[in-house]
């Protein structure tokens, strides 16, 4: 028997415009629920696309088939062949009248957690039994939307003449200095998991690639234990030659609007499952200077922000609420950050070097992206590396690219999980990644 015979349709594909009433089809999936009412038995089959009701009337079908259906165990895997009967009251608007039910695998009992939504489970319980949690409609919906967002990102970049790249994740030195690195043994040497593709993106600008993007993992050995931090995340990175920070901000805000548009158009069922209503953010996004942000925070908070401070969680919420109250929008930029609190490669303004040509793209609740025009002048770059207490010798492979014709360039990086989290309003970032890695979780 060919496994292809185990399914002819997904549950959501059975519609009057594509399937005839009475047509024989085969569905395959998991047993979501069995309801035995004596003379009639309902088996709810669930697959990736939704649910279908299999209806067995005792007087109308083979007794052996009816009795077997009553004994089915939830979450077992089955394949059901039968005829379609369109029925408005049934899930998805039809029911399947079975001729054959094949049990492909029997689920153990009791289940480690409920999949129907009748019994809530804590996040740690769900993650410990992720194989079951992924069967929940709400969990599936999040990852369908994440998939659509990533497809939209690639579509946008390809349309705008970007080249997709893949840079090393095992490196000999820190991308941005600091100690937030995971050391590994690389044969007889120490190496690290990469924090960011930043240095390699810039080398590609020197190589003439002009416009690049990457979607890939990054690793941060930070001991944060919050609802919005991960130690392994997916970063969406961009670098553009012959561009400044305003140019790449425009690319970023248009990308955000494009993602929202695609998700709204193509993920209606998943959004409905999650109870989320989206609107496309208006562009261009509001731009606030760092100095303006200080004024907003200090006018609304008892705890004052001083020049040179980073924007903490309270400040992010304060400014985010201000922007939402004044514009009705959740996304905005903070520009012109102090040079000393940005990475060494951020370009200072020529006429006021204490400020950098840098930005953060913010959501009402948190930072989503950081970017800047980069330093493309070799001597200035070396000076900035030294000013941050780093040794230029450790960046020789990177600095060499700036000695032989590096164009002006700019770029940014954005966390995929944070983006999905803020778009869907999920409470915890771990809900937006299949198998999260944080300081306490290394399995599954």
Swiss-Prot record:
NCBIfam families: aspS_nondisc, PRK05159.1. Its cofactor is Mg(2+). It is an enzyme of class 6 (ligase). Binds 3 Mg(2+) cations per subunit. The strongest magnesium site (Mg1) is bound to the beta- and gamma-phosphates of ATP and four water molecules complete its coordination sphere. This is Aspartate--tRNA(Asp/Asn) ligase. GO terms for molecular function: aspartate-tRNA ligase activity; aspartate-tRNA(Asn) ligase activity; ATP binding; magnesium ion binding; RNA binding. It comes from the Archaea. Mg(2+) 2 binds at residues 367, 370. Belongs to the class-II aminoacyl-tRNA synthetase family. Type 2 subfamily. It is found in: Cytoplasm. The gene is aspS. Homodimer. Keywords: Aminoacyl-tRNA synthetase, ATP-binding, Cytoplasm, Ligase, Magnesium, Metal-binding, Nucleotide-binding, Protein biosynthesis. It catalyses: tRNA(Asx) + L-aspartate + ATP = L-aspartyl-tRNA(Asx) + AMP + diphosphate. The record marks 91 as: Important for tRNA non-discrimination.
